[in-house]
């Protein structure tokens, strides 16, 4: 056991988490595990897409910042909002990344049983927005992400970006990543074109 003088800063990124958005077991784990980290004394931010379904969760979200996100489709805005959730005597921050054309939809990943044709584009944007959120946290809030805990294919590109296109950014250099795969059947496979 390694003793630390301060708790870890943990950014937990998932495409769904209870009670905000759920299609399966991923939401159960992604909603419960961050709260256990908080109970252990760590500073945790749970980061999710700002789906339409989030509005029905009962959480009260307030604006934090609008971040520019560079994508293959050009520069897009990510609207970051925050809710504070009590966890015992502590609080956990839940942040959402909003971009209406990607996330303000009937379903999380599909509609009428058919996957959205732009799921790769949607979650590549989400991953880029996660990276920009980490930079914002470091620069503007002096909150360096010690561990980025990613869940399933929808967030896995973050690990790739940190080792490739974002490897030179000082704000991200000390961040360690953990990728949890909840169901190997969902791999985020898309045509090459």
Give names to the regions the model predicted.
Residues 1-193:
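Catalytic cores of nucleotide-sugar-dependent glycosyltransferases that transfer UDP/GDP/TDP-activated
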């Amino acid at each position: 056991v390694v003793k630390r003088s301060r708790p870890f800063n943990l950014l937990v990124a998932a495409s769904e988490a209870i009670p905000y958005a759920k299609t399966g077991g991923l939401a159960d784990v992604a909603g419960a595990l961050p709260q256990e980290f908080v109970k252990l004394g760590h500073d945790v931010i749970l980061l999710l897409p700002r789906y339409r379904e989030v509005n029905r969760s009962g959480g009260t979200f307030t604006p934090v910042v609008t971040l520019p996100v560079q994508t293959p489709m050009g520069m897009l805005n990510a609207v970051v909002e925050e809710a504070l959730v009590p966890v015992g005597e502590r609080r956990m921050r839940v942040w959402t990344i909003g971009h209406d054309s990607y996330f303000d939809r009937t379903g999380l990943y599909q509609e009428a049983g058919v996957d959205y044709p732009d799921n790769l584009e949607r979650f590549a944007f989400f991953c880029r927005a996660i990276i920009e959120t980490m930079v914002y946290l470091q620069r503007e809030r002096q909150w360096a992400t010690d561990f980025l805990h990613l869940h399933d294919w929808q967030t896995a590109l973050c690990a790739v970006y940190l080792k490739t296109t974002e490897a030179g950014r000082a704000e991200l250099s000390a961040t360690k990543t953990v990728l949890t795969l909840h169901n190997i059947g969902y791999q985020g496979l898309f045509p090459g074109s």
